[in-house]
């Protein structure tokens, strides 16, 4: 299962649908606290995490995950419109496996990359 966390519900839902279309189980939530609750119920193969969110930003969520022994092995890819190099550096220092900037890659390549990071190859051919 790939868990998507984005405060922009349309973005999370669109990515969830694309991943499902590619043959993967995907769930989207709109906040960091909700994501942490979900992580304690079921650990995903990949957490796709936005940076700029109200209440609890993505870096705080990532830091919290890595501080908990039962969650620290969850793979996290940041997916954000934030282009500040310091944000990416901090995310990687905290343990993010990738930092993808929204709008810089097509959805087909994005889905392929997320599936690769999750260790789940796409189940539909590109034909």
Language model regions located:
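Two-component/phosphorelay signaling modules centered on CheY-like receiver
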Residues: 9-27
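Short amphipathic alpha-helix used as the core "switch/output" element in two-component signaling
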Residues: 37, 59-72
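Active-site beta3 strand of CheY-like receiver
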Residues: 42-48
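Helix N-cap/capping motif at the beta->alpha junctions
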Residues: 28-37, 58
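Active-site residues of response regulator receiver
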Residues: 6, 50, 80
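As written
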Residues: 58, 67, 90-98
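Receiver (REC) domain active-site loop signature in two-component systems and cognate sites
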Residues: 53
């Amino acid at each position: 299962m790939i868990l998507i966390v984005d405060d922009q519900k349309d973005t999370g839902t669109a990515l969830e649908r694309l991943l499902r279309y590619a043959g993967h189980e995907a769930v989207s939530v709109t906040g960091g606290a909700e994501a942490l609750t979900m992580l304690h119920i079921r650990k995903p193969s990949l957490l796709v995490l936005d940076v700029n969110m109200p209440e609890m930003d993505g870096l705080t969520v990532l830091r919290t995950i890595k501080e908990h022994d039962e969650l620290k092995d969850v793979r996290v890819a940041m997916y954000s419109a934030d282009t500040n190099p310091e944000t990416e550096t901090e995310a990687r220092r905290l343990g993010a496996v990738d930092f993808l900037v929204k709008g810089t890659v097509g959805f087909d390549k994005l889905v392929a990359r997320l599936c690769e990071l999750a260790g789940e190859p796409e189940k539909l051919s590109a034909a």
